């Protein structure tokens, strides 16, 4: 509420509902969305809860160890994730559909030190598709309209 006193156009929300009961989370998220419509506020939502992300966002940026790996409109990211980390992340969301069993992607490999990361893709040590090129810095590239991915193999992995 204090953040709204100055009529901001941009608010950073860092895990704003993580410690709240699910029913309270929904009320807070709905209030934030109403305020966004009424006041034209833009939010940067930082969270690990992909259900919250899906509910409140228009666009999503996925980061791995501080490195942006994918950004896309929300609906497209959930229906067609392209980066291997995003695919693994979304596979971890529990499904409520008992007729559609979702295959969970289990990540293996060693975590890169966030204190002293190597150049290149920070996900490479855990990525099942890593190749030599992954040791080089990866630029975000637009692979679909408005959908950017930081992966040198995205075109060939898109069909997997």
Task: Specify the residue positions occupied by each region the protein language model found.
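Conserved catalytic motifs of ABC-family nucleotide-binding domains
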Residues: 7
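P-loop NTP-binding/switch modules centered on Walker-like glycine-rich loops
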Residues: 12-16, 20, 24-102
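Charged, flexible cofactor/metal-binding loops and thiol motifs
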Residues: 73-160
């Amino acid at each position: 509420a204090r953040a709204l006193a100055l009529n901001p156009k941009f608010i950073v929300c860092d895990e704003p509902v993580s410690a709240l009961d699910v029913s309270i989370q929904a009320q807070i998220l709905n209030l934030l969305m109403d305020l966004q419509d009424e006041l034209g506020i833009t939010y940067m939502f930082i969270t690990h809860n992909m259900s919250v992300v899906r509910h409140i966002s228009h666009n999503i940026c996925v980061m791995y160890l501080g490195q942006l790996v994918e950004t896309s409109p929300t609906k497209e990211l959930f229906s067609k994730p392209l980066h291997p980390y995003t695919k693994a992340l979304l596979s971890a969301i529990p499904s409520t559909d008992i007729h559609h069993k979702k295959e969970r992607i289990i990540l293996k490999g060693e975590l890169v030190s966030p204190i002293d990361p190597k150049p290149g893709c920070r996900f490479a040590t855990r990525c099942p598709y890593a190749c030599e090129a992954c040791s080089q810095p990866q630029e975000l590239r637009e692979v679909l309209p408005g959908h950017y991915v930081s992966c040198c193999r995205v075109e060939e992995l898109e069909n997997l």
